[in-house]
Amino acid sequence: GGTVGVQDDWFYDTAAQFLANRGYLVLQVNYRSSGGRGADFLEAGYLKWGTRIQQDLIDGVKWAIAEKYADPQRICVYGGSFGGYSAMMTTIRAPGMFKCAVGYAGIYDLAMMYKKGDIKSNESGRSYLKTVIGKDDADLAANSPDKLADKIDVPVLLIHGEDDKRAPFAQAKAMRAALDAAHKPYEWLSKPGEGHGFYDEKNNIEFYNRLQAFLEKHIGKGA
């Protein structure tokens, strides 16, 4: 998730633990705008959602390959919320690097954040959006995965709660429509009553089973 001020550290992460348990190496990158590294680092990601932040993630993958941690023929990108956005954008910015992409409760249309969702509902939220993604329509479109779906070169899995207030269900539907229009392969899982992430136990079981099956299909079983 993110972007501003969040960070990955040595803490329990359900998805990371699940994937590691299934034999997959998990790489979590503290990209620019992550917390705990000072104001300059925090602000370095402003207006860079679809560019420099994605390059930080891509550079992390290149490092993992160079260090022999990752098999370059078996890499998939997964993320939730902003991570869902990044899952789509990294495949666009680094064609050929990934074999599949999974977006969970993701943001796929930046301009829509000014129209739908709870962030735009108060002045602080609107100020946040202007600071981190800007207001220029051309820039927003140029950095929105749903406007660049024709550049996605891997199978996609989209997962979303239909009552999500932070990243509204309309975000996922926009991405799905864009993939349809571009004739790109994807799988879909949405659940009514779920918000920004799944909380119902049965839905989570289905989610993780689908995630595992998708990974096994496209990059093989874990070690």
Where do the protein language model's features map onto the residues?
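Active-site-proximal cap/loop segments of hydrolase catalytic domains
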Residues: 6, 12-22, 28-223
